[in-house]
Amino acid sequence: DVVMTQTPASVSEPVGGTVTIKCQASQSIYSNLAWYQZKPGQPPKLLIYKASTLESGVPSRFKGSGSGTDFTLTISDLECADAATYFCQGSBYTGTVFGGGTEVVVKG
């Protein structure tokens, strides 16, 4: 089964800053990678699918890139509302697996 390794576990940046979250798959998953945002008491929100396709209504400040085994989520022009935990989700023929999550703290 594919294993998704997500880094860092936590990151803190000021309002207006940029956060980069990385996700590495143990084997190629092509572009079968999604990113989710989760806030307490709310269901996970899909941000990006197929590695780089922005879900409808998601601001372009969120950018996904990568293919194969290495993927990145970049959040630019950080806003207080971006404070959340972010997860990658990789899929292959065995099913889907989530990364361990990254807590984003926005200062300001």
Swiss-Prot record:
Q: Where is this region: Framework-2?
A: 35-49
Segment Framework-4: which positions? 98-107
Say yes or no: keyword Disulfide bond present.
yes
The record's region (Complementarity-determining-2) falls at 50-56
* UniProt region (Framework-3), positions on chain: 57-88
Please report any disulfide bonds recorded for this protein chain, giving both cysteine positions.
23-88, 80-108
- Pfam families the record matches: V-set (PF07686)
What is the protein named? Ig kappa chain V region BS-5
